[in-house]
Curated annotation (Swiss-Prot):
The organism of origin for this protein: Geobacillus thermodenitrificans (strain NG80-2)
One of the GO biological process terms: inositol catabolic process
Gene3D superfamilies: Jelly Rolls
PANTHER family: 5-DEOXY-GLUCURONATE ISOMERASE
Family: Belongs to the isomerase IolB family.
Record's protein name: 5-deoxy-glucuronate isomerase
Classification of source organism: Bacteria, Bacillati, Bacillota, Bacilli, Bacillales
Length: 274
């Protein structure tokens, strides 16, 4: 298996099914966890020096922090309903407690925090929805925590790729601290597949090909993108979902397309406008 794939496992005693830390990934900023909680189960964590974005992938929950409480949040029972999720932003030096009101799949997105912003609910109505690309590189985007919304480090977005389509395409990268042209951002991809016995294909490669891996990704896999371009393909018969977490020294998403393939987007958009 590729060193960039972290596979999910059966829930442990606290419900965790996958975990990425900066230490385990060999980088500095991004952490990511998923919990599969049964109805009535409770998860309690301190954020310490990290901020967190709790994304309710599916199911309903009560969530409270040190100063805030939200009851009976959650709307979708499956990510492929394509309804924007409920999420909760939690600053560093805080605590969160999640009580599952139904079986619950919860993503915990983590990055360094400074305690600048208070805890808040991010309801579906505040999630920006857009269609990006055209033709067989068109995909649906849910901007959960974009750079236009307050946070210290985190950027969080989910993407739906129709069967037979590509996303994160044209291949792009954000691994150089070269503003305003490109920002350095580490990134995780948490994949789900419908039907769940299918697979996605993801490539991670650099200009000099010091990294050049093409991976078969299963349902529940996390792909690490420390640097390089990272396109995704959904084979016929299977639609893909992924939740992206990004963070780096500056909270901005400035990317560079692979110049060999940048023309594809222009070609697809031109065909769409005809």
């Amino acid at each position: 298996m590729s060193r960039f794939i972290i596979s999910s496992h059966s829930p442990n005693e606290e419900g965790n099914v996958v975990r990425v830390t900066p230490e385990s990934a060999g980088w500095e900023y991004v952490g990511f966890e998923v919990y599969a909680l049964t109805k009535g189960q409770t998860l309690r964590k301190e954020t310490i020096d990290q901020e967190a974005c709790l994304v309710l992938l599916k199911g309903k929950a009560n969530i409270h922090t040190r100063h805030e409480r939200w009851e009976n949040i959650g709307l979708r029972m499956d990510v492929f309903e394509k309804i924007p999720p409920y999420s909760v932003y939690v600053p560093s030096n805080d605590v969160y407690e999640v009580q599952a009101l139904t079986d619950l799949e919860l993503a915990v997105c983590l990055a360094p925090g400074k305690g600048t912003y208070p805890a808040r609910l991010i309801p579906p109505s505040e999630v920006g929805v857009e269609m990006r690309g055209a033709g067989n590189i068109e995909r649906r985007i849910h901007n959960i925590l974009p750079e236009s919304k307050p946070a210290d480090s985190l950027l969080v977005v989910e993407v739906f790729t129709p069967e037979g389509n590509w996303s994160s395409y044209p291949p792009h990268k954000h691994d150089q601290h070269n503003l305003p042209h490109e920002s350095y951002l580490e990134e995780t991809y948490y994949h789900q597949i419908n039907p769940d016995h299918g697979f996605m294909v993801q490539r991670v490669y650099t200009d000099d090909r010091s990294i050049d891996e093409t991976m078969v990704v299963k349902n529940g896999d996390v792909v690490l993108v420390p640097k390089g371009y990272h396109p995704v393909s959904a084979p016929p018969g299977y639609e893909g979902y992924y939740l992206n977490v990004m963070a780096g020294p500056v909270r901005t998403w400035k990317f560079r397309n692979d110049p060999d393939h940048e023309w594809v987007m222009e070609s697809k958009l031109a065909a769409k406008q005809k």
